[in-house]
Amino acid sequence: MAKQIQAIRGMNDILPTQSPLWQKVEAVLRSSVSAFGYSEIRTPIVESTDLFKRSIGEVTDIVEKEMYTFEDRNSDSLTLRPEGTASTVRAGNEHGLLYNQEQRLWYMGPMFRHERPQKGRYRQFHQFGVEVYGIGSADIDAEVLMLSARLWDLLGIKEHVALELNTLGDPAERAAYRDALIAFLEQHKDKLDEDSQRRMYSNPLRVLDSKDPQVQAILGDAPALMDYLGEDSKTHFSTLCELLDAVGIQYTINPRLVRGLDYYNRTVFEWVTTSLGSQGTVLAGGRYDGLVGQLGGKDTPAVGFAMGLERIVLLLETLELTSDIAPEVDVYVTAMGENCVVEAIKVAQELRQQLPTLKVMSHCGGGNFKKQMKRADKSGAQFALIIGENEIANNQVAIKPLRTNNEQQLVTRSELVAKIAELI
């Protein structure tokens, strides 16, 4: 027997028993962005490597360690997309969507990072994101946070997530703070862990995000970014906080929140949970006003967020919030004998045509009554329709409940559609 080929480590199959929960999450995401008037954009999963080097930053962990990069037959360097924002900006610039225009966009699809697989973190993962271009005021920051809060309401996890906010100021303010932070870190260099020492000059703000307890203790005396902000940045942030207060969205200001990508400025935020252990972030984003210009377009204000679907699914499973998933099949149509197959197929087709949202599965492959009812039960259907020679002779169909103890009932063929519509 030939050796069985396995899935690549960290790239998982979503099996038929799992897909209904995924479909529920995806439906909530789609309905939420639709309610806010956002439009979908779909981009390729493979992009030029330079796109991510220029957007994410060459000294970030993603570019240095985690990207799936290869040369094609033309010796061009290509990369499987590790996130969605850069591709969205590239598409917007390329197709003239962003020049002097406002755009509210969303995307959903697979992303790729060569990380160590662990709970809630995989090498292929699915990301949902929202991007707004052309609006620089704090009210649009509030809108994307309101949209994200709506997701938790609809998914039933509002009480299990919390919003953290910070502001990074504009590039000039951040540069002044960067110099002050480097000067502070140099005084404590011998006490920093290896990662923080490496980042101290290349990306010092990421040291604020260190998970090392000793580094965090040192940072207790570090200069505060808020002290380096100008009036415009302070006003933008305070306005955002006032708007969130006005609509009842609770938040915590976290001065250590910096985000892992180089392109953020001013507002940054994360929705976190304590229900997934170390992988606590379920949605993150912020403002990136310089990215469109950085990738060859006209300078354009922008704000957005991204969330990993695997973590949302894991959170719902952890909290045992999966019981309301709709069944894959509503009605299972059986044919009790070869002479009944044609009639059974006609019944199934009539139900699908008359009740377009009804999920109808027909039994195929023959078999006795016991076998067919076993298949019907395994399908998850609420009802089995039994079509035998007696039923055909009397122009009837038997409706057998599979999930309750209610009695089986006979209805005429002319009554069937209305009766099923009433029962489902």
UniProtKB/Swiss-Prot annotation:
NCBIfam families registered for this protein in UniProt: hisS
GO terms, biological process: histidyl-tRNA aminoacylation
Key words, A-Z: Aminoacyl-tRNA synthetase, ATP-binding, Cytoplasm, Ligase, Nucleotide-binding, Protein biosynthesis
EC id: 6.1.1.21
HAMAP family in alphabetical order: His_tRNA_synth
EC main group: ligase
PANTHER family: HISTIDINE--TRNA LIGASE, MITOCHONDRIAL-RELATED, HISTIDYL-TRNA SYNTHETASE
Gene, per the UniProt record: hisS
Name of the protein in its database record: Histidine--tRNA ligase
Similarity remark: Belongs to the class-II aminoacyl-tRNA synthetase family.
Species whose genome carries this gene: Shewanella frigidimarina (strain NCIMB 400)
Membrane-spanning parts: none
Molecular function (Gene Ontology), one example: histidine-tRNA ligase activity
Reaction(s) catalysed by this chain's protein: tRNA(His) + L-histidine + ATP = L-histidyl-tRNA(His) + AMP + diphosphate + H(+)
Broad class of where this protein is predominantly found: cytoplasm
